[in-house]
């Protein structure tokens, strides 16, 4: 037990989240925050647990609090972007993904998410450029390859779509699962639709 250790409570909360005890995780983050209200990590960790329960407004509040203390906190910016996306505010999500990738240029998932938000918003050229750059730098990054598959297909480039998809199926088969894309990875609806159309050859 960690009667007075904020970090201990926060770490135990993270473990609880991993094993599926989301409410227990939130309880531990609450204890960590009450012991050390100025420590940032428990707010981010609590936000992640709140997201797991679909408590978007609570998660948003936690991430906004972190950003108010540390405007360049790329984890909070990225997570807040995911919340905005989950509530269909893709323009806000795009700007936040952009900030997260600006403050941590090596954060490949933030850059891929930025491209996906651009894809959703109809900024197809920007999305394609970003995805191609990402794949050049990280050839085994499945998210960017899957996104480019969907984008190629929507542009009528079947050959390019096929070659990107071959790599995806070897790297991460979850990308063919529509529910996983919606609920876990949380892609925007248009890229999901285009990827599913590709898979079904529509």
Task: Outline where the language-model segments fall.
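Structural marker of alpha-solenoid helical repeat scaffolds
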Residues: 1-2, 35, 69, 102-103, ...
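Terminal, low-structured helical/coil segments at or just beyond the last alpha-helical repeat
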Residues: 162-202
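Conserved alpha-helical positions within TPR/SEL1-like repeat arrays
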Residues: 7-18, 27-30, 40-52, 74-85, ...
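TPR/TPR-like (Sel1-like) alpha-helical repeat modules
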Residues: 132, 136, 140-142, 146-176
């Amino acid at each position: 037990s960690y009667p007075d250790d904020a970090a201990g409570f926060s770490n135990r909360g993270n473990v609880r989240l991993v094993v599926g005890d989301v409410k227990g995780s939130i309880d531990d983050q609450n204890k960590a925050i009450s012991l050390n209200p100025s420590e940032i990590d428990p707010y981010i960790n609590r936000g992640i647990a709140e997201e797991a329960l679909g408590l978007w407004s609570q998660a948003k509040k936690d991430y906004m609090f972190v950003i108010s203390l540390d405007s360049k906190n790329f984890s909070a910016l990225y997570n807040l972007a995911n919340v905005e996306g989950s509530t269909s505010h893709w323009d806000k999500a795009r700007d936040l993904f952009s900030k997260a990738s600006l403050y941590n240029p090596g954060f490949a998932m933030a850059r891929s998410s930025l491209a996906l938000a651009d894809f959703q918003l109809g900024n197809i050229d920007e999305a394609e450029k970003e995805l191609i750059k990402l794949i050049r730098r990280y050839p085994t990054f499945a998210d960017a390859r899957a996104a480019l598959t969907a984008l190629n297909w929507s542009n009528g480039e079947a050959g390019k779509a096929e070659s990107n998809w071959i790599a995806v199926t070897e790297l991460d088969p979850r990308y063919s699962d529509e529910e996983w894309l919606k609920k876990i990875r949380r892609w925007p609806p248009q890229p999901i639709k285009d990827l599913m159309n590709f898979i079904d050859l529509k």
